[in-house]
Swiss-Prot record:
Organism of this sequence: Alexandromys fortis (Reed vole)
Chain sites annotated for binding heme b b566: 97, 196
Position of the signal peptide: none
Gene name of the encoded protein: MT-CYB
Cofactor note (record): Binds 2 heme b groups non-covalently.
Alphabetic keyword roster: Electron transport, Heme, Iron, Membrane, Metal-binding, Mitochondrion, Mitochondrion inner membrane, Respiratory chain, Transmembrane, Transmembrane helix, Transport, Ubiquinone
Keyword Secreted included in the entry's annotation: no
Binding site for heme b b562: 83, 182
Name of the molecule in the record: Cytochrome b
Length: 380
């Protein structure tokens, strides 16, 4: 009798994706982040669903409804903090996942990579709108500042901003539509994830050597299911330590003050995972230029396959580009730090230097390093 997992139409699909999937025999723990991101998405959807049962998207009651969740709902405080810190864990995994992709040249699987870039934009949009919902000071002013950037678009800018706001300022209409979008987007993200996986399984996974591994495959289950499970345990442990012991460490104290359109906080800044992009935005004195740099700071990832000059796929055997890569990582950490600092000397000049370095390393230095390595190794 044939095994049901190989005959049943639905189970067969799942089996080919998770159980009998041929996987490279040498993929390291850097390949765990895909499954961890899946777990983060599930956690966010579930906690978000339970929060939505008690949340009201009205400017007069939004803040107090979040307070009510934390005070009066059974384990409401836990659900709320799991959702808030779950977003941070999501972005940590995302950045590591993207970093892995850049290091090992996974961007050469163009369809999978571009789908990933679209996913990154979708997750960032979702997180931004979610941050507005508690209707604290930083929620309100963050929404005002970021949506207002669209007014830099020539000719249609002002109309576009007022259309998104649903009025002449961030108000009830804005909050209601942000809640609607924040609710629907994770389900769209889930659909995009399936497409991401579909494209991935067309080519098969990359591996740390960057070489073709078709001759050396092992079944995904049990080898990588058990390996993913270890990653999941570590993630959940870090996540619960963060949620139960330091729930507010990544948040902004200003968001515990109800939104007040008449009182601007001294330093408006987004959540930590947007700070690098915010620093790039602020480093350009021109409004439209800043907006373009902000978008390009993420969109530049889509150019990675075009900027690849090396005859080798991964950075495993490329010390010069490796050096550039780790300088880029350090540069992103500097940008993240600068994004949270006030706009004054010396932070302005540090931010501008780090922003120039960011684009220079990706667009100029890494491609040149690839060519130099080709010459050194006579790979022309």
């Amino acid at each position: 009798m044939t095994v049901i997992r190989k005959t049943h139409p639905l189970i067969k699909m799942i089996n080919h994706s998770f159980x009998d999937l041929p996987a490279p025999s040498n993929i390291s723990s850097w390949w765990n982040f895909g499954s961890l991101l899946g777990l983060c998405l599930i956690i966010q959807i579930l906690t978000g669903l339970f929060l939505a049962m008690h949340y009201t998207s009205d400017t007069t009651t939004a803040f107090s409804s979040v307070a009510h969740i934390c005070r009066d709902v059974n384990y409401g405080w836990l659900i709320r903090y799991m959702h808030a810190n779950g977003a941070s864990m999501f972005f940590i995994c995302l950045f590591l996942h993207v970093g892995r992709g850049i290091y090992y040249g996974s961007y050469n699987m163009t369809e999978t990579w571009n789908m990933g870039v679209i996913l990154l934009f979708a997750v960032m949009a979702t997180a931004f709108m979610g941050y507005v919902l508690p209707w604290g000071q930083m929620s309100f002013w963050g929404a005002t500042v970021i949506t207002n950037l669209l007014s830099a678009i020539p000719y249609i800018g002002t109309t576009l901003v007022e259309w998104i706001w649903g009025g002449f300022s961030v108000d009830k209409a804005t909050l209601t539509r942000f809640f609607a979008f924040h609710f629907i987007l994770p389900f769209i993200i889930t659909a995009l994830v399936l497409v991401h996986l579909l494209f991935l399984h067309e080519t098969g996974s990359n591996n740390p050597t960057g070489l073709n591994s078709d001759t050396d495959k092992i079944p995904f289950h049990p080898y990588y299911t058990i390996k993913d499970f270890l990653g999941i345990l570590i993630l959940l442990m870090v996540f619960m330590i963060l949620t139960l012991f330091f729930p507010d460490i990544l948040g902004d104290p200003d968001n515990y003050t109800p939104a007040n359109p008449l009182n601007t906080p001294p330093h408006i800044k987004p959540e930590w995972y947007f700070l690098f992009a915010y620093a790039i935005l602020r480093s350009i004195p021109n409004k439209l230029g800043g907006v373009l740099a902000l978008i390009l700071s993420i969109l530049i990832l889509a150019l990675m396959p075009i900027l690849h000059t090396s005859k080798q796929r991964a950075l495993t055997f490329r010390p010069i580009t490796q050096t550039m890569y780790w300088i880029l990582v350090a540069d992103l950490l500097i940008l993240t730090w600068i994004g949270g600092q006030p706009v004054e000397y010396p932070f302005i000049i540090i931010g501008q230097t780090a922003s120039i370095a960011y684009f220079t390393i990706i667009m100029i230095l890494m491609p040149i390093a690839g060519m130099i390595e080709n010459n050194i190794l006579d790979l022309e």
